Amino acid sequence: MHSFKKTKKKKGLLGIKIDFQKAYDRMEWKFLFLNLKAFGFSNKFTNLINQCLSTMQYSVLLNGGKCPSFKGLRQGDPLSPYLFILGSEVLMRLISREVDRGQLIAIKVSSNVPTISKLCYADDVILFSKAKMSELSSLKICLERYCPWSGQKVNVEKSGIFPSKGLSQQFLNKIKSC
């Protein structure tokens, strides 16, 4: 993101930070288990993960009263980031497919580095594209497919756009209205 703002050569590029609302809590277990199987994990391993997740329930005391119990990937559990990333791999593959089809152009943020179209670490996702409405539309379609499958919901207030130099305010306003 730093090179977007400082380098004069980088024009017409966007970094888009996606924040998923209560990302761990919202991850659909059925979706996660289907992914584990699709990625070649054994039934034994998948069942073990299922047991780890399904036997835990949380309940919170608030103002002396007990709130309803809830389930979900647990923040602080060492396994949760890995499971979340496995679930996020579907979004990453949707985006990679759009790059392969030529609908998105992977970008170079610096010389002598590979091109990138996305970065994912735990529940943080950053997408990169050229500043073209057609590419933004492709990214939006990927998110619109992924979110219902996974249970994720984009938190628009905490998500953000990081433009390179040379983009008009009119174009940035148009992006924000999408």
Where are these regions (language model features)?
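Nucleotidyl polymerases of mobile genetic elements and RNA viruses
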Residues: M1-C178
